Amino acid sequence: SPLLGTPQGLSVYVDGVRANEPFGDTVNWDLIPHSAIASMDLIPGSNPLFGLNTLGGALSVHTKDGFSHPGGQVELSTGSFQRRNAEFSYGGHKGSLGWFVSGDWFKEDGWRDYSNSEVKQFFGKLSHRSATGEADLSLLRARSDLIGNGLLPESMYKQSRNQIFTRPDA
Protein backbone atom coordinates (compact mmCIF):
# COMPACT_ATOMS: atom_id res chain seq x y z
CA SER A 1 0.00 0.00 0.00
CA PRO A 2 1.33 3.48 -0.76
CA LEU A 3 0.15 4.72 2.65
CA LEU A 4 1.69 3.34 5.86
CA GLY A 5 -0.90 1.53 7.94
CA THR A 6 -3.34 1.07 5.08
CA PRO A 7 -4.24 -2.59 4.41
CA GLN A 8 -2.60 -4.18 1.38
CA GLY A 9 -5.71 -6.08 0.33
CA LEU A 10 -3.60 -9.23 -0.10
CA SER A 11 -3.66 -12.00 2.50
CA VAL A 12 -0.49 -14.10 2.76
CA TYR A 13 -0.52 -17.60 4.22
CA VAL A 14 2.53 -19.74 5.04
CA ASP A 15 1.55 -23.41 5.26
CA GLY A 16 -2.03 -22.35 5.97
CA VAL A 17 -1.18 -19.85 8.73
CA ARG A 18 -1.81 -16.16 8.04
CA ALA A 19 1.48 -14.23 7.90
CA ASN A 20 0.16 -10.66 7.64
CA GLU A 21 1.05 -8.34 10.52
CA PRO A 22 -1.89 -6.92 12.52
CA PHE A 23 -0.94 -3.30 11.70
CA GLY A 24 -1.51 -2.56 8.04
CA ASP A 25 -1.55 -6.21 6.94
CA THR A 26 2.11 -5.95 5.95
CA VAL A 27 4.24 -9.08 5.58
CA ASN A 28 7.73 -9.58 7.01
CA TRP A 29 9.20 -11.33 3.98
CA ASP A 30 12.56 -11.53 5.72
CA LEU A 31 11.13 -14.30 7.95
CA ILE A 32 10.96 -16.81 5.10
CA PRO A 33 14.25 -18.15 3.68
CA HIS A 34 14.17 -18.57 -0.10
CA SER A 35 15.64 -22.04 0.28
CA ALA A 36 12.60 -23.14 2.35
CA ILE A 37 9.93 -22.26 -0.23
CA ALA A 38 8.56 -25.21 -2.20
CA SER A 39 5.82 -23.35 -4.11
CA MET A 40 3.53 -20.33 -4.10
CA ASP A 41 -0.07 -20.02 -5.30
CA LEU A 42 -1.86 -16.76 -6.08
CA ILE A 43 -5.63 -16.85 -5.60
CA PRO A 44 -7.05 -13.73 -7.28
CA GLY A 45 -10.11 -11.79 -6.18
CA SER A 46 -12.01 -11.34 -2.97
CA ASN A 47 -13.04 -14.46 -1.08
CA PRO A 48 -14.43 -14.56 2.49
CA LEU A 49 -12.66 -17.89 2.98
CA PHE A 50 -9.37 -15.97 3.36
CA GLY A 51 -10.56 -13.47 5.99
CA LEU A 52 -10.87 -9.72 6.27
CA ASN A 53 -9.06 -7.34 3.92
CA THR A 54 -8.57 -9.98 1.24
CA LEU A 55 -9.86 -7.66 -1.45
CA GLY A 56 -6.90 -8.19 -3.79
CA GLY A 57 -6.62 -11.95 -3.32
CA ALA A 58 -4.51 -14.36 -1.33
CA LEU A 59 -0.98 -15.70 -1.66
CA SER A 60 -0.35 -19.19 -0.34
CA VAL A 61 3.29 -20.10 0.39
CA HIS A 62 4.10 -23.80 0.81
CA THR A 63 7.36 -24.71 2.55
CA LYS A 64 9.50 -27.77 1.94
CA ASP A 65 9.48 -30.86 4.14
CA GLY A 66 11.64 -33.97 4.47
CA PHE A 67 9.23 -36.17 2.52
CA SER A 68 9.03 -34.05 -0.63
CA HIS A 69 12.59 -32.61 -0.51
CA PRO A 70 15.05 -35.21 0.84
CA GLY A 71 18.79 -34.55 0.60
CA GLY A 72 20.96 -31.51 1.02
CA GLN A 73 21.93 -28.44 -0.94
CA VAL A 74 24.44 -25.62 -0.44
CA GLU A 75 24.66 -22.47 -2.54
CA LEU A 76 27.26 -19.70 -2.27
CA SER A 77 27.36 -16.49 -4.30
CA THR A 78 29.05 -13.10 -4.37
CA GLY A 79 28.35 -9.83 -6.10
CA SER A 80 28.97 -6.11 -6.30
CA PHE A 81 29.52 -3.99 -3.18
CA GLN A 82 31.05 -6.93 -1.29
CA ARG A 83 27.79 -8.89 -1.46
CA ARG A 84 28.01 -12.37 0.02
CA ASN A 85 25.20 -14.90 0.12
CA ALA A 86 24.99 -18.44 1.51
CA GLU A 87 22.03 -20.82 1.51
CA PHE A 88 21.75 -24.36 2.81
CA SER A 89 18.98 -26.89 3.17
CA TYR A 90 18.78 -30.48 4.31
CA GLY A 91 15.79 -32.77 4.56
CA GLY A 92 15.02 -36.41 5.08
CA HIS A 93 12.62 -38.89 6.56
CA LYS A 94 12.60 -42.21 8.34
CA GLY A 95 9.35 -44.08 8.48
CA SER A 96 6.54 -41.69 9.37
CA LEU A 97 8.85 -38.93 10.70
CA GLY A 98 10.32 -36.25 8.42
CA TRP A 99 12.60 -33.27 9.00
CA PHE A 100 13.76 -30.28 7.02
CA VAL A 101 16.10 -27.43 7.95
CA SER A 102 17.15 -24.45 5.91
CA GLY A 103 19.12 -21.28 6.45
CA ASP A 104 20.02 -18.20 4.42
CA TRP A 105 22.66 -15.55 5.13
CA PHE A 106 23.16 -12.34 3.18
CA LYS A 107 25.61 -9.49 3.78
CA GLU A 108 26.78 -6.54 1.71
CA ASP A 109 28.56 -3.22 2.19
CA GLY A 110 25.89 -1.33 0.23
CA TRP A 111 26.05 1.00 -2.74
CA ARG A 112 26.29 4.17 -0.66
CA ASP A 113 28.21 5.25 2.41
CA TYR A 114 27.05 3.66 5.68
CA SER A 115 24.54 1.35 3.97
CA ASN A 116 25.81 -2.09 4.93
CA SER A 117 23.07 -4.71 5.34
CA GLU A 118 22.80 -8.21 6.78
CA VAL A 119 20.03 -10.83 6.92
CA LYS A 120 20.09 -14.16 8.78
CA GLN A 121 17.21 -16.62 8.36
CA PHE A 122 16.47 -20.10 9.71
CA PHE A 123 13.60 -22.49 9.03
CA GLY A 124 13.00 -25.87 10.62
CA LYS A 125 10.15 -28.32 10.16
CA LEU A 126 9.28 -31.65 11.78
CA SER A 127 6.61 -33.70 10.04
CA HIS A 128 4.63 -36.80 10.90
CA ARG A 129 2.69 -38.70 8.23
CA SER A 130 0.32 -41.61 8.72
CA ALA A 131 -2.54 -43.27 6.89
CA THR A 132 -5.05 -41.23 8.90
CA GLY A 133 -3.44 -37.79 8.76
CA GLU A 134 -0.40 -35.59 8.97
CA ALA A 135 1.03 -33.00 11.34
CA ASP A 136 3.80 -30.42 10.92
CA LEU A 137 5.66 -28.31 13.46
CA SER A 138 7.58 -25.38 11.95
CA LEU A 139 10.00 -22.80 13.35
CA LEU A 140 10.93 -19.53 11.62
CA ARG A 141 13.69 -17.29 12.95
CA ALA A 142 15.17 -14.23 11.27
CA ARG A 143 17.27 -11.20 12.01
CA SER A 144 17.61 -8.42 9.48
CA ASP A 145 19.45 -5.13 9.40
CA LEU A 146 18.65 -3.59 6.02
CA ILE A 147 19.96 -0.10 5.40
CA GLY A 148 20.15 1.83 2.17
CA ASN A 149 17.37 4.32 1.78
CA GLY A 150 17.91 7.98 2.55
CA LEU A 151 17.31 11.38 1.07
CA LEU A 152 20.15 13.33 -0.45
CA PRO A 153 20.04 17.04 -1.32
CA GLU A 154 20.85 17.80 -4.94
CA SER A 155 23.97 19.78 -3.99
CA MET A 156 25.43 16.72 -2.22
CA TYR A 157 24.33 14.40 -5.04
CA LYS A 158 26.36 16.45 -7.53
CA GLN A 159 29.47 15.92 -5.37
CA SER A 160 28.99 12.17 -4.94
CA ARG A 161 25.88 10.01 -5.29
CA ASN A 162 27.33 7.59 -2.72
CA GLN A 163 26.90 10.05 0.15
CA ILE A 164 24.17 9.96 2.74
CA PHE A 165 22.66 13.11 4.25
CA THR A 166 21.68 11.71 7.64
CA ARG A 167 22.63 8.52 9.36
CA PRO A 168 21.83 6.09 10.77
CA ASP A 169 18.63 5.57 8.80
CA ALA A 170 17.12 2.98 11.11
Per-range role (PLM):
Residues 1-3, 15-17, 45-47, 64-66, ...:
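Solvent-exposed coil/turn segments that connect beta secondary-structure elements
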Residues 1-44:
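Periplasmic plug
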Residues 3-4, 52-55, 115-118:
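Short, glycine-/polar-rich solvent-exposed loops and beta-turns at beta-strand/coil boundaries
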Residues 6, 66-71, 95-96, 131-132:
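Short loop/turn motifs that connect adjacent beta-strands in outer-membrane beta-barrel proteins
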Residues 27, 46-50, 75-77, 111-113, ...:
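Outer-membrane beta-barrel domain signature
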Residues 31-75:
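A beta-strand signature from Gram-negative outer-membrane beta-barrel systems
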Residues 63-71, 99-107, 153-170:
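Flexible, solvent-exposed coil segments and beta strand-coil junctions
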Residues 78-107, 112-149, 166-170:
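Transmembrane beta-barrel wall of Gram-negative outer-membrane proteins
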